[in-house]
């Protein structure tokens, strides 16, 4: 049951159920169209589907799985770890005080692929806690956290539009000291940052900024004089910036909430040379999640809107 439930939740977090019918297209040329009902029937043959209780917590915007663990994030209610013994989700951020409630908006999270107990949470809310953005790092499965303030580099609004999109932070499986992370807006030299020391320090990835995507100056949030660079001139809660980051096999993949060929780009880890991943990918919708199947293939989901509407597609 544990493995079956993990398969179901992993499929959910890949964006398969968020986008209606799924158009599964191979970048190698072949394609298959799957209906939502066919996918449901396939899963139903292998799993028992029920509900899991979370005692409070807002909209569950993402679920990630490791080898033997599951974590969930919410838009205003913190982050949780699933307890297989009790069948409950245990809150990991319940020690935050009222002045820190902005960090209960968890915009993205990831697990170190080499260690289920090492997790990273990208936290921030534009209208609480002085609009600060921090990365929470735990090396003991969420029992305790170190906190790294990255507000001067990027900022996120974990309760904004697009919060259901996938994880904008990723650890390099080949070198877990290398981590990439993306923001909704850039408050420094790039909306994409990286760490080379396991999250202790962070720096701007200027090659991503050279794509020229974040060229609008907006107030963050609206009623302040603090300025940030954004994809559009819309207000802060409409900004979704970097939607996904994924590191795999020496490559870093970065999805951005824009239309056009630069909505999904790739570079070698450590390189500043970002290029469009493929001309065969959609240019009229937004990359929402990236996952990897059992054979190591990339699964990329797209959504037609950063709100809760629009069609979608899944590419392999």
PLM regions with names:
Residues 11-22:
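Sec-dependent N-terminal signal peptides
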Residues 1-12:
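Bacterial Sec-dependent N-terminal signal peptides
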């Amino acid at each position: 049951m544990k493995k079956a439930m993990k398969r179901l939740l992993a499929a959910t977090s890949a964006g398969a159920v968020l986008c209606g019918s799924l158009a599964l297209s191979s970048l190698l040329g072949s394609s298959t169209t799957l209906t939502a009902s066919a996918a449901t029937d396939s899963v139903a043959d292998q799993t028992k589907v029920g509900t899991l209780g979370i005692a409070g917590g807002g909209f569950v915007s993402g679920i990630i799985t490791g080898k033997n663990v599951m974590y969930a994030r919410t838009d205003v209610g913190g982050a949780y770890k699933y307890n297989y013994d009790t069948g409950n989700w245990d809150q990991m951020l319940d020690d935050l005080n009222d002045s820190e409630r902005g960090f209960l908006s968890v915009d993205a999270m990831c697990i170190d692929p080499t260690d289920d107990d090492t997790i990273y949470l990208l936290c921030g809310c534009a209208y609480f806690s002085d609009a600060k953005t921090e990365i929470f790092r735990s090396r003991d499965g969420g029992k305790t956290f170190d906190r790294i303030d990255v507000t001067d580099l990027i900022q996120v609004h974990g309760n904004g539009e697009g919060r259901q999109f996938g994880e904008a932070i990723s650890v390099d499986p080949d070198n877990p000291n290398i981590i990439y992370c993306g923001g909704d807006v850039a408050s420094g030299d790039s909306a994409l940052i990286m760490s080379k020391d396991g999250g202790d320090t962070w720096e701007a990835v200027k090659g991503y900024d050279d794509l020229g995507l974040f060229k609008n100056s907006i107030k963050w949030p609206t009623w302040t004089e603090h300025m940030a660079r954004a994809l559009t001139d819309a207000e802060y809660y409409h900004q979704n910036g970097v939607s996904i980051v994924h590191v795999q096999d020496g490559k870093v993949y970065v999805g951005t909430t824009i239309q056009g060929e630069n909505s999904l780009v790739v570079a070698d880890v450590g390189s500043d040379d970002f290029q469009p991943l493929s001309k065969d990918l959609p240019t009229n919708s937004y990359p929402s999640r990236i996952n990897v199947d059992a054979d190591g293939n990339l699964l990329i989901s797209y959504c037609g809107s950063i709100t809760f509407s629009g069609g979608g597609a899944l590419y392999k």
